[in-house]
Amino acid sequence: MSSALLDEAARIARQFDYPAAEVQRGVTEYIREIDEGLSKEHTTLSQIPTYVTAVPNGTEKGLYLAVDLGGTNFRVCSIDLHGDTTFSLTQSKIMIPRETMASGTAKDLFLFLARQIESFLRIHHNDHFEAHLRRRNEKNGNCEEDLFDLGFTFSFPVRQLGINKGTLIRWTKGFNIPDAVGKDVCALLQNAIDDLGLPVRVAALVNDTVGTLMARSYTSPGETGTFLGAIFGTGTNGAYVEKLDRITKLQTIEHSEYDKTTGEMIINAEWGSFDNHLSVLPNTIYDQQLDADSNNPGIQMFEKRVSGMFLGEILRRVMLDMQRNESLGFLRAGGASTVSVPQESSLYRQWGIDTSLLSLVEADKTENMEQIKVALKDHLKIERPTTDDCKAIQTVVHAIGKRAARLSAVPLAAILLSTGKLQKDDLVDIGVDGSLVEFYPNFEGYMRDALREVPEVGEAGNKKIRIGISKDGSGVGAALIALVASKEETRRKSQ
């Protein structure tokens, strides 16, 4: 019986193979979508101009604020950049009341956020705050220079129109405040800040992936600025430095203001939607079922094969499939006719398997799979799985995780080739963040294997690529974008 189970696990695992020829097809299609996304709006790959036109080099100094609205918590932090690639960070996190998220008005939400900024300043920067108030109350007191510049990480779909201007396209993640849709979220926050008389200027609207790139560029060693930032975690996305003259759609976007002197701009790729039409992406029966049952069928197709939120769901569907085939004896406590999984196990709940389980399963090197047995009990309440059950699960997990890592190489290789970066530079620095790339065993190794298999990258190109973890794009990254934005504002005023 056990050999039938292991044979079936191997058969399913083979469906997740993603060979070199497929990687190459993916890269070719991604390059086509880059060109399309740079030339016009409403394309599969959004290629959003961020209006951030410079990356830091580690010498930047100053005290900046950053706030992060991306889910149920609102984070406020101050970042002191020391000018030597180091920084210190102070932060507080506040849970957003459900009624403010869903039944309030835009004014209610943004006033709530501004009040959190006020209490943070009073606790952590009271001297500065009080000095500002004193100066403002003096006759003709000009306190422009006392203002804190703030980077606003807003992790919802936004149409960005400038470095500190962007209109909300739609809410996600449980938020529903209809009167904010179509409004400039930076202006909404600034108005609430001004109503409270706070010494704060909303200097930049920040995407967390762009923040990842900026944070890496500030903290990474050496002369080379960071070229690309990528997130491989619950979701996946990338941002990279593009030549301004290639972003031809900028000419059609009205009212956009930005610094043209650097000749470059960071592009937010929004690569989760790469190849939504499935011309090149692998598409097993499990991918098809996951997509059909998701809340956005036909959308974010690349993300659904790569990011942590979905890998656990692919595994869950494979496990249920194997369990339904009684002849395999899978999870049947060593051949018993009853299943050894209680009804309340999250195995039976959509999205019930977290990626952390896959990381634990992949990492187990023990002969009897002891770590997997413990993990199955902890995560899924599965009692007494056999060693063969665990081996079958590990075989499938390995295939799902390896495919995700190899797919992750596609946008990296395509962007490197499309920009000619590998030909021009001896070193290309990439900052990455997210639970997969940080904790999934050998994720970067599998990704690099696939990069090497792209002929124009090869071993020589792979050696030029330096990948480093970049933490806290929504904190230090947002502060750095606020810094770039305030420099640009000063430059514009002096013209």
Curated annotation (Swiss-Prot):
The keyword Nucleotide-binding applies. Keywords: ATP-binding, Glycolysis, Kinase, Nucleotide-binding, Transferase. ATP binds at K93, D472, G473, S474, G475, V476, G477. Residues 57-206 are annotated as: Hexokinase small subdomain. Residues 207-472 are annotated as: Hexokinase large subdomain. One of its GO terms (molecular function) is ATP binding. Its EC number is 2.7.1.2, 2.7.1.1. Residues 3-483 form the Hexokinase domain. The keyword Cytoplasm does not apply. GO terms for cellular component: cytosol; mitochondrion. Residues 149-175 are annotated as: Glucose-binding. It catalyses: D-glucose + ATP = D-glucose 6-phosphate + ADP + H(+); a D-hexose + ATP = a D-hexose 6-phosphate + ADP + H(+); D-mannose + ATP = D-mannose 6-phosphate + ADP + H(+); D-glucosamine + ATP = D-glucosamine 6-phosphate + ADP + H(+). It is an enzyme of class 2 (transferase). Activity is relatively constant from pH 7.5 to 9.0. Below pH 7.5, activity decreases with pH. One of its GO terms (biological process) is intracellular glucose homeostasis. Pathway: Carbohydrate metabolism; hexose metabolism; Carbohydrate degradation; glycolysis; D-glyceraldehyde 3-phosphate and glycerone phosphate from D-glucose: step 1/4. InterPro entries: ATPase_NBD (IPR043129), Hexokinase (IPR001312), Hexokinase_BS (IPR019807), Hexokinase_C (IPR022673), Hexokinase_N (IPR022672). It comes from the Eukaryota. Belongs to the hexokinase family. Monomer. The enzyme has great affinity for glucose. Mannose, 2-deoxyglucose and glucosamine can serve as substrates. This is Glucokinase.
